[in-house]
Amino acid sequence: MLNISHPRTRVFYGKRQKKMITEHFKPPFVAKIPRGSAMGRGVYLIRNQGELNDYLSLTDVAYIQEYLPVDRDIRVVVIGRRVVHAYWRIAPQNEFRSNLAQGGSLCLDAVPQEALELALNTALSCRWDDVGIDICRHAGRYYVFEANMKYGKEGFRQAGINYSQLMETMIQNEDI
């Protein structure tokens, strides 16, 4: 997929295809509701057939992703062809999601350049000009988990960045 490093991901449609999920993914794996899974809602860690059945009862389309066991990820916001903010999101204990809305915490420590470059290259390759990209480091590599066109602004607030002013300045400078 555009040479973007990402966890193995597959979409399954219909009853016949859904029956093939466990042929392609062994638990644990991540299952997402394809639309509307914002702020960590609609994202499930599937550990057994019962949890898979519960998930499948919620959606006609199964969006399945390889589970990478990490305790934190990086949110990189790209606007107008440049990285404007990046921060760590740390998952609460016994939770695989690091979303702030799911109890995750925000850390403003420096983000590795390799992660910033992956996010920027992903945004440019996909022609996204206002996106929050979630990245993790696993087994020595960086992976893009997902991209969010409607990303939270709490990271800006905690960093003391006025998001509205940032957008206004970028518009005035014709950066976007």
Predicted feature descriptions by range:
Residues 1-71, 113, 117, 173:
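Active-site nucleotide/adenylate-binding loops and adjacent lid/helix of ATP-dependent enzymes
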Residues 26, 80-81, 139:
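Residue-level signal for tight coil/turn positions that link beta-strands
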Residues 41-126:
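Phosphate-binding site of ATP-dependent enzymes
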Residues 29, 82-85, 131, 143-145:
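Protein kinase-like catalytic core scaffold
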Residues 34, 67-68, 77, 134-136, ...:
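Anionic group-transfer/hydrolysis microenvironments
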Residues 110, 137-176:
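C-terminal active-site "lid" helix and adjoining low-complexity regulatory extension at the edge
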Residues 128-139:
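A short glycine-rich, hydrophobically flanked beta-strand micro-motif that places a catalytic Asp/Glu
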